[in-house]
């Protein structure tokens, strides 16, 4: 079941879920709008092969930076990691589905399907893929819509048990090696 605005406000009011900083205007009919944070990571063009089963120096593959109020320009078809300004804490009985806000999608920007697991705590990191033309994004602008789905029962082992990105603030690059 998807939570309505009333259900979301009830979870927040009872302290079962947290969003910080939070503005009531972020709650929409069936989800919450989240805004762009200040840090970003650009994927570099390189011929170096990254082996996901080994520890790697990821600075060869990513350029990390911080946005000022002017933001950054996402180049055509470029892949960039952004994060939410908001830190969220998910309860054990909710899962989040992240969608790009329609206005950004209508500009040709795209994000892969993204799930926020039950028990996750942190800022959400999103890969955004550029349009056919350059697009400037700025911190503080609402860019994703988080929809909450209630599980049939609280999960037995939530994200805090084995999640690599628990507690993340800003951009946390992939954790390597990925275990087989």
UniProtKB/Swiss-Prot annotation:
Q: What class of enzyme is it?
A: hydrolase
**Which keywords describe this protein according to UniProt?**
Hydrolase, Nucleotide metabolism, Nucleotide-binding
Does the keyword Nucleotide-binding belong to this entry? yes
Q: Where, in this chain's numbering, is dCTP bound? A: 101-106, 117, 159, 168
Q: Which GO terms describe its biological process?
A: dUMP biosynthetic process; dUTP biosynthetic process
Q: What is its EC number?
A: 3.5.4.13
Report if keyword Nucleotide-binding is assigned: yes
Among InterPro entries, the record links this protein to: dCTP_deaminase, dUTPase-like_sf, dUTPase_trimeric
Question: Which Gene3D superfamilies does UniProt cross-reference here?
Answer: 2.70.40.10
Which reactions are catalysed by this chain?
dCTP + H2O + H(+) = dUTP + NH4(+)
Q: What one GO molecular function would you report for this record? A: dCTP deaminase activity
Q: Which pathway does UniProt place it in? A: Pyrimidine metabolism; dUMP biosynthesis; dUMP from dCTP (dUTP route): step 1/2
Q: Name one Pfam family in it.
A: DCD
Q: Which family does it belong to?
A: Belongs to the dCTP deaminase family.
Assembly information from the UniProt record: Homotrimer.
Q: Quote the NCBIfam families the UniProt record gives.
A: dCTP_deam (TIGR02274)
Name the job this protein performs: Catalyzes the deamination of dCTP to dUTP.
Q: Which HAMAP family match?
A: dCTP_deaminase
Kindly provide the name given to this protein in its UniProt entry.
Answer: dCTP deaminase
Give the organism's phylogenetic lineage. Answer: Archaea, Thermoproteota, Thermoprotei, Desulfurococcales, Desulfurococcaceae
Which gene codes for it?
Answer: dcd
């Amino acid at each position: 079941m998807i939570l309505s605005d009333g259900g979301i406000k009830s979870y927040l009011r009872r302290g079962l879920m947290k969003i910080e900083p939070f503005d009531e205007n972020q709650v929409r009919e069936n989800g919450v709008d989240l805004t762009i944070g200040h840090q970003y990571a650009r994927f570099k063009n390189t011929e170096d092969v990254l082996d996901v089963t080994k520890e790697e120096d990821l600075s060869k593959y990513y350029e990390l930076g911080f946005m000022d109020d002017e933001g950054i320009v996402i180049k055509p078809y470029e892949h960039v990691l952004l994060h939410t300004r908001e830190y969220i804490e998910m309860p054990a009985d909710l899962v989040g589905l992240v969608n790009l806000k329609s206005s950004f999608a209508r500009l040709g920007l795209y994000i892969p399907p993204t799930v926020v697991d039950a028990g996750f705590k942190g800022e959400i990191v999103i890969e955004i893929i550029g349009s056919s033309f350059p697009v400037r994004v700025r911190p503080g602008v609402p860019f994703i819509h988080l929809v909450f789905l209630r599980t049939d029962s609280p999960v037995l082992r939530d994200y805090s048990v084995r999640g690599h990105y628990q507690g993340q603030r800003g951009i946390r690059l992939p954790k390597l090696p990925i275990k087989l």
